Amino acid sequence: MIQFTVDERKRLRERSSLYPDTIQRLKNETDEIFHGEIIVPKSGIANWTLYYYCPDCSVKLKFDRTSPHRHRCPSCKKTFTGEPYDSSWWGLINMKNYEAVFSMAVIWLATGEQAYADKAIKIMKEYAAFYPDYEVHGDIPYNGPGRAGAQTLDEANFQRTFAM
């Protein structure tokens, strides 16, 4: 699938100079993943991200991409370990990765900065290496199972965003 023709890419690059704030916002949003270590699960262990909340005060846990096994509530300051928090953390990692890959591709299309394309490609290659062996999981009949996510819809978003 060709998302943009050569002429469309050329026009996009020409027009992107008119919107430096937008390009900078995309760079800021991808900064942690662009400059950080590539974190991709070796097995399909992602769970529902709705579990990533404090069971005591219902506040979303503070996400730290470098802490897959310790999850802290910003309100009551409790730290949670184990399931369902660890696998929900992986679901969030997968989501943040595919969103960053898409944004990095847009940055590259708009600016020609090859480093963004290179990082996006590296992340996608990491997934390509492990995704075929991700276990299909989830047994809610009306949702369908997932691999990189908790359900079929998560899976569709994951793959669609990479394909774009």
Identify what each model region corresponds to.
Residues 1-164:
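Extracellular glycan-targeting catalytic surfaces
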